[in-house]
């Protein structure tokens, strides 16, 4: 790969247009079209899930969790591909380190790639790299968060990390109807968010379950942030959305019901899956701002054939892509 010391300049050229030209706001209601399954797990694997994706040199770079056909979870990336239709033939590369439910981004202030995850040495951990395409080129684990939460069967789960000009924020769930937040000054990142967090959203367990993601909405007249959270509904998994004008502020429900969700069976257009589950909005930049272009909203998600129910670990999740109508 080329020298990443040139990355900030390259990124500024490559992604300046979407930031400047985005003149769309977030819709008040969402309606999508969906692909079918974009890829099948390679031999020996039963599922592909928990997707995190960034634009990289004009292509897509995706990391994910897999489960084998036995009893083990693992982590992987896909080889680079230019179009989502090419995901089916991209290489599937197992990692020697386990980075379940990953979050991938480029931390521009320190010129380093970050892969954050759960089930590591601490509650949340992270790895660093200068070449994110190499599934096994990452550093040893470092602590990202060392705290715990109460009233949760799983403990902390499904982190995401995002920054503004001064502060880095950690958001996470607990499969318990709550969303949590921690923060640190941006000049101290990458590092440990510590042990303390605050509850920023609270509801019934199924309404705020897991898979929280937070994004900067590009091209707006004022700072706008979008949060999506996976919920459990009568018709399957779906995403609710919330908005805020600061990452450290309060969050307002936007498309937050199963009948009118951010994305779910009611509006996905998908015919192969009832679940619209853990994934990532397609970002316009790879950096810590987690920026999305509201003129071109797409959601990379995990779906599955609802007629197949072999038990949670072996549920046959596959990647799919929603595109806003």
Curated annotation (Swiss-Prot):
Optimum temperature is 47 degrees Celsius. InterPro entries: GH62_arabinosidase, Glyco_hydro_beta-prop_sf. The gene is axhA-2. GO terms for cellular component: extracellular region. The keyword Lipid metabolism does not apply. Glycans are attached at residue 83. Pfam families: Glyco_hydro_62. Optimum pH is 5.4. It is an enzyme of class 3 (hydrolase). It is found in: Secreted. This is Alpha-L-arabinofuranosidase axhA-2. Its EC number is 3.2.1.55. Keywords: Carbohydrate metabolism, Glycoprotein, Glycosidase, Hydrolase, Polysaccharide degradation, Secreted, Signal, Xylan degradation. GO terms for biological process: arabinose metabolic process; L-arabinose metabolic process; pectin catabolic process; xylan catabolic process. It catalyses: Hydrolysis of terminal non-reducing alpha-L-arabinofuranoside residues in alpha-L-arabinosides. Belongs to the glycosyl hydrolase 62 family. One of its GO terms (molecular function) is alpha-L-arabinofuranosidase activity. Its main location: secreted. Alpha-L-arabinofuranosidase involved in the hydrolysis of xylan, a major structural heterogeneous polysaccharide found in plant biomass representing the second most abundant polysaccharide in the biosphere, after cellulose. Releases L-arabinose from arabinoxylan.
